[in-house]
Curated annotation (Swiss-Prot):
Region of interest (Disordered), residue spans: 131-151
Name this polypeptide is given: SsrA-binding protein
InterPro entries with a match to the protein in the record: SmpB, SsrA-bd_prot, SsrA-bd_prot_CS
Example of a GO biological process term: trans-translation
Name of the coding gene: smpB
Keyword match Cytoplasm: yes
Subcellular location: Cytoplasm
GO cellular component, one term: cytosol
GO MF term list: RNA binding
Keyword annotations of the record: Cytoplasm, RNA-binding
Length: 151
């Protein structure tokens, strides 16, 4: 089992999308952003990634300002470049060109070498009836575990 110290998770992504494939990417950050992430002050709830030319950027990821960085602080929602291999970038570009597919941030974490990584998912949006179905499944599993505990 590999070591992951999770900084932020996007739990809504699993509810709103069918995750078809997962990728790990590095992320280009400034010093004040790294310090803020070490304190756990990040949110990737509404973040997504998109390609611009031959690069992939993470948009709408909120990393809070670091209090001690004063005038050298960063912008909280700036686009951040993701570090991927050329083959992975080409795969992402090909899959996101298909209608209905998007690239969603699933989690942000420190790996065992203490580098900040982001887990991306190539995802297809769920329809309303799919969301209702997943709610029913979750409720049924919860009820099953309650019944087992009572016996």
């Amino acid at each position: 089992m590999e070591y992951k110290k999770i900084i932020a998770q996007n739990k809504k992504a699993l509810f709103n999308y069918f995750i078809e494939e997962r990728l790990e990417a590095g992320i280009v950050l400034k010093g004040s952003e790294v310090q803020s992430l070490r304190q756990g002050k990040a949110s990737i709830e509404e973040s997504h990634a998109a390609d611009t030319g031959n690069e992939v950027f993470l948009y709408n990821c909120h990393i809070a300002e670091y209090e001690k960085a004063n005038r050298f602080n960063h912008s909280t929602r700036r686009p951040r470049k993701l570090l991927l291999h050329k083959k992975e970038i080409n795969k992402i570009i090909g899959r996101t060109k298909i209608k209905g597919y998007t690239l969603v941030a699933l989690s942000m974490y420190f790996n065992k070498k203490n580098k900040i990584k982001i887990e991306l998912g190539i995802a297809k949006g769920k329809k309303l009836h799919d969301k209702r179905e997943s709610i029913k499944e979750k409720d049924w599993k919860r009820d099953q575990s309650r019944l087992i505990r009572q016996k």
